[in-house]
Amino acid sequence: MGAHHTATEQSARLFADACAVIPGGVNSPVRAFNAVGGTPRFITSANGYWLTDADDNRYVDLVCSWGPMILGHAHPAVVEAVQRVAADGLSFGAPTPSETELASEIISRVAPVERLRMVNSGTEATMSAIRLARGFTGRPKIVKFSGCYHGHSDALLADAGSGVATLGLPSSPGVTGAATADTIVLPYNDVDAVDEIFEQVGDQIAAVITEASPGNMGAVPPEPGFNAALRRITEEHGALLILDEVMTGFRVSRSGWYGLDPVDGDLFTFGKVMSGGLPAAAFGGRAEVMERLAPLGPVYQAGTLSGNPVAMAAGLATLRTADDAVYAALDKNADRLAGLLTDALTDAGVTHRVQRGGNMLSVFFTAEPVGDFATARASETWRFPPFFHALLDAGVYPPPSAFEAWFVSAALDDEAFDRIAAALPGAARAAAEASRPA
């Protein structure tokens, strides 16, 4: 392996093999590099902040499996917990003590959550929370915000962020008008728009769902008081407030975004960090609402693998290992990365903004503050692919989309930042020299 990480023969071969059996060669669209071009790197191992690909290239990881790996990869406490539990069986289809332990740990951190139900993915968590909100209120309509991504269930794909934004789709083929007929999409950070829609049809609205601090149109935090305004408006009209913390939960603080902006949602959704990188998620909230779920109430929700003991073990080990020092390191590392990005892009004369949602961050190639999906899409996203590839070729792995957040781990050290600092000037020049598409 030379100074540059441009050898991709094995990744290219593996990608061709994958394309023969998997649509697009990937199991989640952003991994295909369609937004940036080039060959997706096939990762064979990870440890700490290092990723190693099939061509033996090593990268400083600034994706962290899209958020979960706050401790770094293969942390000994998490690996030991998973190995110990796996030796006793992988799945039972019956209650286990670890489900209660992890639920109790989460409830102890987020005060409005009195009851919690385990599921298998963030999509399942938000889908179930929406069903529960409708069942609890007896109302059909849901309010969401343009650019906020809540998984790929049909009703919530309307004007979503994440991969839908990356592909430039307004929604997705296959999502019928009937599926989104009761989904109202409003501009993010616009309290007046929320007030207006509630004045018009408030008695039909079951819930407002929002990312507690969005990271799926890039890092676009709520304006001060925005989430509190949603709380006020929903309470006035008898609707529920669902705060989606799948991305922010237990990453931006010990208590997630709630720890930074303590707004009492009626329901919360969690994922990513809470399962330490294994497939698990959860939704929870007020006991009065949660007790409408089967088997106590009439709102049905179920899952064969929900509460999987191996995922519960990974989640417990992650949360219990992530002490105050870990969260201090996450914030410090995000500060350091943001500073390096700002310095390099400024030195290269590139108009940009580095935006933060706690220790999540994004680079927008624009001079304007990015407060919603419209301003995110108006940025010079065509500068991002050469910026991305220059970093990748220098051994730094950022997210392969201009509309995704960057994530740090507590494992990053001076060696990691030395590599990032060495890579950024060339990447900034590549962004500066990029040509606007015809």
From Swiss-Prot:
Keywords: Cytoplasm, Isomerase, Porphyrin biosynthesis, Pyridoxal phosphate. One of its GO terms (biological process) is protoporphyrinogen IX biosynthetic process. Its cofactor is pyridoxal 5'-phosphate. GO terms for cellular component: cytoplasm. Pathway: Porphyrin-containing compound metabolism; protoporphyrin-IX biosynthesis; 5-aminolevulinate from L-glutamyl-tRNA(Glu): step 2/2. It is found in: Cytoplasm. The modification N6-(pyridoxal phosphate)lysine is found at K272. Its EC number is 5.4.3.8. Pfam families: Aminotran_3 (PF00202). It catalyses: (S)-4-amino-5-oxopentanoate = 5-aminolevulinate. The keyword Isomerase applies. GO terms for molecular function: glutamate-1-semialdehyde 2,1-aminomutase activity; pyridoxal phosphate binding; transaminase activity. Homodimer. PANTHER family: GLUTAMATE-1-SEMIALDEHYDE 2,1-AMINOMUTASE, GLUTAMATE-1-SEMIALDEHYDE 2,1-AMINOMUTASE 1, CHLOROPLASTIC-RELATED. Belongs to the class-III pyridoxal-phosphate-dependent aminotransferase family. HemL subfamily. This is Glutamate-1-semialdehyde 2,1-aminomutase. The lineage of its organism: Bacteria, Bacillati, Actinomycetota, Actinomycetes, Mycobacteriales. The gene is hemL.
